Amino acid sequence: MQQRPLGNSGIRVGRLALGTMTWGRTTDEYEARDQLAAFLDAGGTLIDTADVYAEGVCEELLGTLIQEFDCRDSVVVATKAVSLPNTERRFNASRGHLLDALDRSLKRLDVDHIDLWQMHAWDTYTPLEETLSAIDSAIASGKVRYAGMSNYSGWQSARACTMQQLKPGSTPLITTQMEYSLLERGVEREIVPAAKSLGIGILPWSPLGRGVLTGKYRHSIPIDSRGASPDTSAFVNLYSDERAKRIVDALATAAQGLDASPAEVALAWLRDRPGVIAPILGARTNAQLLLALGSEELELPEEITAALNDISDPHMGYPES
């Protein structure tokens, strides 16, 4: 797998990342083991998780498998803090919560440091200075090597990065993790140009448009899919409108012409977008992951890229354009 810099840092990572949000829930330990084996075999290095995934079980499972595969020195472990499941306050980026959450993540992952520690979301209740101070403390302690953001808006990203860059002795933020796909290109309005200006890299989550870009929902809803589950159907149905249908149809046509799957084409398109480091592959099964990893070998012709750009155009307006 080809390598890329992890934002403005000295770390290089594979240009596809392994997501683990389903681990400990719909992905059991056997599938997770197969996924990690396939990812490592493909040359992947960046593995993304979060303290709230499966109420911490995900981090525990990842830590167990890293030990089993004896691969700690060859992988880049990224996790997140801030989110609070099943509580009235959804996000907590206070110093106390962050540092306690970090210690719990280290214990569950069974590692002595986190390579990339990401703030999962913006917390409207906590002063940004306090959040950034906690990041500095974590890095100074050796428990964290680098830090990044997730789901920050354009102005939030710019403010956080600028404050870190201007504060003597602080370590700049190096990444932002955002939803980004052919179906969701809103980040191109402010996040992408901000990332370029600030020297941060983009890690796209849900690069297959919540599964819709695989094409499996074109004609019906598979009974074993997230689209059929009462708990997750709303997550998928966001992309059930006519615009999404046109994009998926165009993607399927392009894939047929390239003798590839729609998923491979969608991932290759996103992988090559400006500022992108590595789309995060959050597969439920190893078969799904293997299909997604096939995109590493696919290079899109310019005319296919242009056609996909056109059909999925986010329609920039004032003041972006």
Predicted stretch roles:
Residues 27-39, 93-109, 157-161:
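Short, acidic/polar
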Residues 123-310:
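Beta/alpha (TIM)-barrel catalytic core signal, keyed to glycine-rich beta->alpha loops juxtaposed to Asp/Glu
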Residues 1-75:
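N-terminal binding-site loop/beta-alpha segment at the start of enzyme catalytic domains
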Residues 18, 49, 79, 116-119, ...:
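Conserved beta-strand positions
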Residues 7-23, 78-90, 113, 118:
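N-terminal small/glycine-rich loop or linker at the start of catalytic domains
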Residues 106-124:
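Active-site groove signature of glycoside hydrolases
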Residues 8, 64-73, 106-110, 139, ...:
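Acidic (Asp/Glu)-rich catalytic clusters
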Residues 11-16, 43-46, 71-75, 111-115, ...:
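Short, well-ordered coil/turn segments that N-cap beta-strands
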